[in-house]
């Protein structure tokens, strides 16, 4: 079941890729993908290229994929291990969701962080109290880690 669904999603992604994202299997392993997300232009991540790993569980799509940033990113909802705090990857997951929708949600999280549900409270605090410092730091991390 899972491999059939994953294959269908891969075909759909290749046919109609989400804006500024791409994804596909690593080597021949259909259950392990790598995705690339371009930093949204209207965010401090603009110009950055972020690598994201995707691991599908054997019971996908009934369980969510494990998605993590491989590129360091300064963000209240993404920690230093690359873990992402995103409701659709946890309790809001539904089998109707696709990797394409997950990637789009991650892109919008880059544009609009959710400081009220942070994974990194210090960054969330900075985002709320000193937006300029947050944006400067996020921009410098993007230049340092996500621009080749």
From Swiss-Prot:
Top-rank taxon, per record: Eukaryota
State a single Gene Ontology molecular function: ATP binding
The record places domain UBC core at: 1-147
The protein's matches in SUPFAM superfamilies, at most eight in alphabetical order, are given as: UBC-like
Q: Where is the active site?
A: 85 (glycyl thioester intermediate)
**What does the record give as its pathway?**
Protein modification; protein ubiquitination
Top-level EC class, please?
A: transferase
Q: What is this protein called?
A: Ubiquitin-conjugating enzyme E2-17 kDa
């Amino acid at each position: 079941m899972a491999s059939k669904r994953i294959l269908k999603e891969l075909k759909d992604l290749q046919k109609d890729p989400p804006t500024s994202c791409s994804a596909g299997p690593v080597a021949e392993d259909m259950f392990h993908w790598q995705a690339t997300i371009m930093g949204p232009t209207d965010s401090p991540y603009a110009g950055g290229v972020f690598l994201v790993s995707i691991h599908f569980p054997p019971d996908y799509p009934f369980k969510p994929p494990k998605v993590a940033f491989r590129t360091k990113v300064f963000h209240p909802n993404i920690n230093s291990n690359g873990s992402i705090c995103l409701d659709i990857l946890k309790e809001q997951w539904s089998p109707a969701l696709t990797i394409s929708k997950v990637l789009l949600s991650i892109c919008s999280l880059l544009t609009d962080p959710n400081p009220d549900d942070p994974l990194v409270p210090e960054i969330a605090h900075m985002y709320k109290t000193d937006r300029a410092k947050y944006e400067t730091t996020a921009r410098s991390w993007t230049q340092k880690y996500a621009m080749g």
